[in-house]
Amino acid sequence: MTALSTISSVYGPVDSWRVGKSLGIDLIMNTSTCSFNCTYCQLGFIQDITKERKLFISTEKIINDFNLSKWKEADIITFSGSGEPTLAINLGEVITKIKHITDKPIAILTNGTLLINQEVRNNVLNADLISVKLDAPDDKTLKEINRPADGVTLHSIILGIKELKSDIKDLNKSTKLQIQIMFMPQNKNQIESLAKLLNEIKPDEVALNTPTRPYPAGWDIITRGAHGEDTKKIKFPIKPLKTLSLEEAKNIENKLRELTNLQIISVYKN
Ligand code: SF4
């Protein structure tokens, strides 16, 4: 088996329906590590469910890997990878260093659980796009879909997102705040309560998603960027997940638009 230290922390570019050609940065690479354990996670069952921030990979290795990568072919640089990127304490430092190399836009995909922490918000504020996951309108659904680390509540997540929105405004940043909702059997009938939260947060954009990547029976570094044909390379059995029908997705999109008046994009094309 290849040692993780010999694998690049930078992967892709991979095609993303939301942002085009996306170069992935994996700040974790230490098994799958996240403050959530989503039932649909492309990494499979999360091996280290934690809220504790730490250094996983040195900034030096990440910048070195970045320089050796195909970053020039990417439309956007996305922090995602083998878990929750805000768990890495060098997230802010890596963003600053990459901004010295290129002016390509930077996106962070986060579950929002650590945004309550001012230091984490300071780390993400230099990104051009922050996409925050919000699948559940209450703690019961949060536990069912996202299975968070102990102590994470919907209230703390919403508070963190609102604080981030205020920071963006107060500091006059051009950072776009996107809320991403993964629709599952557990939340597809909770549109009104999700719309209520969206109206409180008032993000710049809402991205509607449904699990298009399979759920692997184990973690393998390749799962961080695997989709389409790549999923055949995952060494564990994979399970396709229940997705919404086009009709259901369109109904949800229309209803959310009617209830929120927000800018909405969807993985489902017409
Ligand atoms: S937040 Fe993302 S990385 Fe974490 S378990 Fe959910 S889908 Fe996986």
Describe the predicted segments one by one:
Residues 73-74, 79-81, 98, 106-107:
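Glycine/small-residue-rich loop that forms an oxyanion/phosphate-binding "nest" at active or ligand-binding sites
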Residues 4, 17-57:
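Canonical Radical SAM [4Fe-4S] cluster-binding loop centered on the CxxxCxxC motif
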Residues 38, 74, 127-128:
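Short, well-ordered alpha-helix to beta-strand connector turns
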Residues 44-79, 93:
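Conserved alpha-helical substructure of the radical SAM core
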Residues 86-222:
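Conserved AdoMet/S-adenosylmethionine-binding subsite of the radical SAM
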Residues 51-54, 144-151, 222-223, 238-242:
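Short glycine-enriched, charge-decorated loop/helix-capping segments at active-site entrances
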Residues 27, 79-81, 181-183:
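Short glycine-centered, acidic/aromatic-flanked micro-motifs in structured strand/loop junctions
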Residues 2-18, 29, 64, 187-270:
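Auxiliary Fe-S-binding modules of radical SAM enzymes
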